[in-house]
Amino acid sequence: MTDSTRSLRNCLAPAKLNLFLHITGRRPNGYHDLQSVFQLLNWGDTLHFTLRDDGRVARVTDVPGVPEESDLVVRAANLLKAHTGTTAGVDIEIDKCLPMGAGLGGGSSDAATTLLALNRLWQLDLSRTELQSLAVKLGADVPFFVFGKNAFAEGIGEELAEVELPTRWFLVVTPRVHVPTAEIFSDELLTRNTKPVTIADFLAQQNSDAGWPDSFGRNDMQQVVTSKYAEVAQVVKWLYNVTPARMTGSGASVFAAFQSKHEAEAAKAQLPTGWNGAVAESLNEHPLFAFAS
């Protein structure tokens, strides 16, 4: 990342994985109570921010299928302007890397990186807690990325506690299919009564590499998604021939963990022709963590 008084360039918006995802209940308002562990990855979209003197917020790169006015990065910047009253403006460039609708948190991470970067570039000095209170207005996953550490999440995803995770390499395979999150959450076959677990339960298991991630929990959405989307089912089945694998979020991406980059790259090299796979190392902290206190 490069930093000047007029711009912040090469700001990573890291992807996330749900190492497990349990649905423990459903609220009267339709929202679901969840438990999950969020893992940051050293892989994601790259954003660039340049000050404008006219006060405008402008996205200067096209993102296919995402109108500028509804883009989370533009909404995040405008939300920050409205909250603080700053007269500063910004040009935002986005180098998209993460597939959309894949369960990797791409749009949410872009929004969080925007909040953190503009907190620095606009010299706002908002606290992390204050930024998280804004982030929740943009989406359920955005507060996690502002939180900036690997986390045990509860509630609807807004109750976060830092969790220490070992360094691992991941192979993430994304089928060429978009899985609508709302469709999966509304499916009558979705498990909604998984018994709650604790951080201690998770930590006792995740330090053992044998069979991980199968050694703890599951993704309650995976069975519904694989029954509806054959492409996701094919990836899960193929990866299981190599190593234990699991879907992240509501899909469609599926991941497997390895002890080394070499092992992950070797598995990627075996992927069937035309499959989209990426190798990424785990992160302990968001690259812009220091931009809020």
Swiss-Prot record:
UniProt source species: Burkholderia ambifaria (strain ATCC BAA-244 / DSM 16087 / CCUG 44356 / LMG 19182 / AMMD)
Similarity comment: Belongs to the GHMP kinase family. IspE subfamily.
Catalysed reactions, semicolon-separated: 4-CDP-2-C-methyl-D-erythritol + ATP = 4-CDP-2-C-methyl-D-erythritol 2-phosphate + ADP + H(+)
InterPro entries: GHMP_kinase_C_dom (IPR013750), GHMP_kinase_C_sf (IPR036554), GHMP_kinase_N_dom (IPR006204), IspE (IPR004424), Ribosomal_Su5_D2-typ_SF (IPR020568), Ribsml_uS5_D2-typ_fold_subgr (IPR014721)
Any Pfam family: GHMP_kinases_N
Pathway where this protein functions: Isoprenoid biosynthesis; isopentenyl diphosphate biosynthesis via DXP pathway; isopentenyl diphosphate from 1-deoxy-D-xylulose 5-phosphate: step 3/6
Enzyme nomenclature, EC number: 2.7.1.148
Binding positions for ATP per the UniProt entry: 99-109
The keyword Kinase belongs to this UniProt entry's keyword annotation: yes
Listed name of the protein: 4-diphosphocytidyl-2-C-methyl-D-erythritol kinase
Annotated catalytic residues: 16, 141
EC category name: transferase
